[in-house]
Amino acid sequence: MSDYKSSLNLPATQFPMKANLANREGGFLKKWQNDGLYDQIRQQNQGKPKFVLHDGPPYANGDIHIGHTVNKVLKDMIVKSKSLSGFDAPYVPGWDCHGLPIEFNVEKKYGKVGVKIDASTFRSKCRKYADQQVLKQKQDFQRLGILSDWDNPYLTKDFQYESDIVRALGRIVKNGHVSKGYKPVHWCTECGSALAETEVEYKDNQSEAIDVKFRIIDDSVFNMNKPVSVVIWTTTPWTLPANEAVALHPELNYVLVDIGDEYLLLAQALVETSISRYGIEATIGEQTFSGSELEGLKIKHPFYDKQVPIILGEYVTIDAGTGAVHTAPAHGQEDFIVGLKYNLPVECLVDIKGVFFKETELLGGQFIFKANDSVIEILKQANTLVKHESLMHSYPHCWRHKTPVIFRATPQWFISMQKNGLIDTVNREISKVQWMPDWGKKRIELMMDSRPDWCISRQRFWGVPITLFVHKQTGELHPNTQALFVSIANRIEKEGIEAWFKSDAQDFIGNDANDYDKTTDILDVWFDSGVSHFTVLKARKELSNVADLYLEGADQHRGWFQLSLISSVAINGKAPYKNVLTHGFVVDKNGKKMSKSLGNVMSPQKIVNNLGADVLRLWIASTDYTSEMTVGDEILKRSADSYRRIRNTMRFMLANMQAFNPVEHLLDNKQMLDLDKWIVAKTANLQTQIIKAYEQYNFHHVVQLILNFCSNDLGGFYLDVIKDRQYTTQANSLARRSAQSALHHITEAMVRWLAPILSFTAEEIWQNMPSEKNTSIFLASWYQDLTFGYENKAIDITREISPFIRKQMEGMRGEKIIGSSLESEIDIYCETDIFSTLSQLDDELRFIFITSYIRIHSLNEKNDDCIKAIEGVFIKVSKSRHEKCVRCWHHREDVGNNAKHPELCGRCVENVDGKGEIRKFA
């Protein structure tokens, strides 16, 4: 038996089957960094249309988690796809570097300020800690394959950034949006500081719910012979010492309930449920009183010797309780607002740690939550407690300490939502922005509807100072405030925030220092990131004043999206972004939020070290990120399987372009075989869909299209069909060069499709492609040399028939009748139109079905052995009775006809010893 292996064009490539991503990806990272790839891209794309995705800064504390990974990879895919589309798409990463989490970590190591460490040294330690965290996170982000200006990120602790924060504050003050007020704000007793809305999260908490009687002093309006008390319901007993009124709804009806020795005043709509809760016998009166009729009545505090009024509040509801609301203006926002209307006192009895001041009657020195029991006992002794029970309900907690927060009235600095029409302008700007998904618009509108003034001051150490001087008598700002903002910002630009803290008032305002207080508060850390449109977008020449896109998690509607919008409108009168895109949270396979306590955390570092960054990126791209994103070992395994399918497809094509040089061998589309024209046109149409999906940030659709192409059009059809032609025709034949030309076009297109998602693998493919290339795939644009518009009815028909033929062959394999499909022969019986179409392929039809013989018959020739395939087509598959050609493995009648090559079929003889076979179709 002769060996004809040397006469075959066997595939060969240096692109390995085994990806070994975890080890191989690092080499590409190093090359990108050594080559200065990001700078090369910027230089190449200079002058092209700009697309700016502005990075919302993660907090510089701890390892990056899977949520960070999703966020950064989504951004990276957008930036890379925009670059492929011909945009100059710079990407500047950022980090949030001030704030409490860093303070707490430094405190753990060095102790509290004023106890074991001075404030200046403390801030220095915070700065150093932030540097360490940024470096660690940056390395992890880079390992994910994210191309960014890593050498020039924006850090909110940088002197330049800190000074620009002060300049931004100056602009907002100048525009009349900043005010000082004594108002109740969210307060964390652990932090000892005010919290912004964005720093509060809601979770279940057990509270003590109590119903309390306030004896009505002037009860003549009721004309009753027994005392009357209005009953309130509250879940914060500790706030009762600060009570200044009881609020009723003006339009609700209230009734008297006779309980024997007195009457209780309750909302008519809540009488039945209240009596049931109290477990008492009672008679409900028939006469009703509207809330507005009872306004101004004096009532007795339940345990202090003082009188408070009945007032009216539209916010009173009948969802729970009694329809009467205990009002403590120092400890509730609605209480405070209604208190302004009635000129109620705003007296805070609680210090920064949540302890009652010593002079507080009956409760001095007690921590508020522990004081609940004391308050309940005092009420019992005063005979004013109607009901007490524990209640599990949603309650605000500090997002850092996970402890309940309170409302506490303190002097704070605010950005007023009402002054100078800020909220109205914000709402107008919301409608100009494209929100994706579209529910984002409604969500932020609802948040703005109930948006309180933004408390921007904090009573901490590590942050940008509120650089204001306030007159000791009048409370007015210094008349040279704007000039002071300029000079102070210039000093901070050179020396950092220490320039403010180490100086006294005289250093800035000279002799006026005797009349003015130098503010000691620092800015809310959300202000730092919220003004990044001013400090980064506007400040960096490679960016633009308004970002094309902000992309963050769904929680940022109440965070960075909202506060960036407010600050931008306060400074510039317009939104800082044109489009806002939201992604969902990552949950485990059971839909549960990831947490260390549940033991369900998926570490991106472990995934990358095990499977490689590209598999993790593929999972992100494959998932509909607009809702919750589910991840687990099994899901990642499926992503790894999908990755292998793509890699194997690309490897097959690279291997079959062996000895192909596009400069010498690339055929014009008109010269190519019909099947090759068809697959190139298919690729062209698919590229149009893929680019559109990228433009819509619809990455999971991109992945679906690519996988379907690999599995069906390529792996399930075209690549199988061309194997015979690739391996057996002469090396430089038109048939082989045609297929290689098609593979060249497909690979050139696909490597670009893959680049935003499988960045490392795309670069590896690029380096193994047989042509002169730029140094990196990321310097390329979408492939432009695909030919559209070719259709072929014969191919469409064969693809419809093919599954039925394969099924027949599988059955025959199962019965051991045949092994390879080349051991079979096929008879097709079809109606006239199909007969005519398929007949045009002549003997080449067998290559489409990968069989040794195909015979086409008229439909009326079919017999009972035939199986229906499609309408108008029947098939019969049988075992070939002919000898096998040792070179192409086809079973052909002419095997043995050539004396020189008795083991070869006729066409193999022609390919080995003749001019080579001629192919036109497949």
Curated annotation (Swiss-Prot):
<dbReference type="InterPro" id="IPR009080">
    <property type="entry name" value="tRNAsynth_Ia_anticodon-bd"/>
</dbReference>
<dbReference type="GO" id="GO:0005524">
    <property type="term" value="F:ATP binding"/>
</dbReference>
<dbReference type="GO" id="GO:0000049">
    <property type="term" value="F:tRNA binding"/>
</dbReference>
<dbReference type="InterPro" id="IPR002300">
    <property type="entry name" value="aa-tRNA-synth_Ia"/>
</dbReference>
<comment type="subunit">
    <text>Monomer.</text>
</comment>
<dbReference type="GO" id="GO:0005829">
    <property type="term" value="C:cytosol"/>
</dbReference>
<dbReference type="GO" id="GO:0006428">
    <property type="term" value="P:isoleucyl-tRNA aminoacylation"/>
</dbReference>
<keyword id="KW-0963">Cytoplasm</keyword>
<feature type="short sequence motif" description="'KMSKS' region">
    <location>
        <begin position="593"/>
        <end position="597"/>
    </location>
</feature>
<dbReference type="Pfam" id="PF00133">
    <property type="entry name" value="tRNA-synt_1"/>
</dbReference>
<dbReference type="InterPro" id="IPR014729">
    <property type="entry name" value="Rossmann-like_a/b/a_fold"/>
</dbReference>
<dbReference type="GO" id="GO:0008270">
    <property type="term" value="F:zinc ion binding"/>
</dbReference>
<dbReference type="InterPro" id="IPR001412">
    <property type="entry name" value="aa-tRNA-synth_I_CS"/>
</dbReference>
<keyword id="KW-0547">Nucleotide-binding</keyword>
<dbReference type="GO" id="GO:0004822">
    <property type="term" value="F:isoleucine-tRNA ligase activity"/>
</dbReference>
<feature type="binding site">
    <location>
        <position position="885"/>
    </location>
    <ligand>
        <name>Zn(2+)</name>
    </ligand>
</feature>
<dbReference type="InterPro" id="IPR013155">
    <property type="entry name" value="M/V/L/I-tRNA-synth_anticd-bd"/>
</dbReference>
<keyword id="KW-0648">Protein biosynthesis</keyword>
<dbReference type="GO" id="GO:0002161">
    <property type="term" value="F:aminoacyl-tRNA deacylase activity"/>
</dbReference>
<dbReference type="InterPro" id="IPR010663">
    <property type="entry name" value="Znf_FPG/IleRS"/>
</dbReference>
<keyword id="KW-0030">Aminoacyl-tRNA synthetase</keyword>
<feature type="binding site">
    <location>
        <position position="908"/>
    </location>
    <ligand>
        <name>Zn(2+)</name>
    </ligand>
</feature>
<dbReference type="InterPro" id="IPR002301">
    <property type="entry name" value="Ile-tRNA-ligase"/>
</dbReference>
<keyword id="KW-0067">ATP-binding</keyword>
<keyword id="KW-0862">Zinc</keyword>
<keyword id="KW-0436">Ligase</keyword>
<dbReference type="InterPro" id="IPR009008">
    <property type="entry name" value="Val/Leu/Ile-tRNA-synth_edit"/>
</dbReference>
<dbReference type="Pfam" id="PF06827">
    <property type="entry name" value="zf-FPG_IleRS"/>
</dbReference>
<dbReference type="InterPro" id="IPR033708">
    <property type="entry name" value="Anticodon_Ile_BEm"/>
</dbReference>
<feature type="binding site">
    <location>
        <position position="596"/>
    </location>
    <ligand>
        <name>ATP</name>
    </ligand>
</feature>
<comment type="similarity">
    <text>Belongs to the class-I aminoacyl-tRNA synthetase family. IleS type 1 subfamily.</text>
</comment>
<feature type="short sequence motif" description="'HIGH' region">
    <location>
        <begin position="58"/>
        <end position="68"/>
    </location>
</feature>
<feature type="binding site">
    <location>
        <position position="888"/>
    </location>
    <ligand>
        <name>Zn(2+)</name>
    </ligand>
</feature>
<feature type="binding site">
    <location>
        <position position="552"/>
    </location>
    <ligand>
        <name>L-isoleucyl-5'-AMP</name>
    </ligand>
</feature>
<keyword id="KW-0479">Metal-binding</keyword>
<dbReference type="Pfam" id="PF08264">
    <property type="entry name" value="Anticodon_1"/>
</dbReference>
<protein>
    <recommendedName>
        <fullName>Isoleucine--tRNA ligase</fullName>
        <ecNumber>6.1.1.5</ecNumber>
    </recommendedName>
</protein>
<comment type="function">
    <text>Catalyzes the attachment of isoleucine to tRNA(Ile). As IleRS can inadvertently accommodate and process structurally similar amino acids such as valine, to avoid such errors it has two additional distinct tRNA(Ile)-dependent editing activities. One activity is designated as 'pretransfer' editing and involves the hydrolysis of activated Val-AMP. The other activity is designated 'posttransfer' editing and involves deacylation of mischarged Val-tRNA(Ile).</text>
</comment>
<feature type="binding site">
    <location>
        <position position="905"/>
    </location>
    <ligand>
        <name>Zn(2+)</name>
    </ligand>
</feature>
<dbReference type="InterPro" id="IPR023585">
    <property type="entry name" value="Ile-tRNA-ligase_type1"/>
</dbReference>
<dbReference type="InterPro" id="IPR050081">
    <property type="entry name" value="Ile-tRNA_ligase"/>
</dbReference>
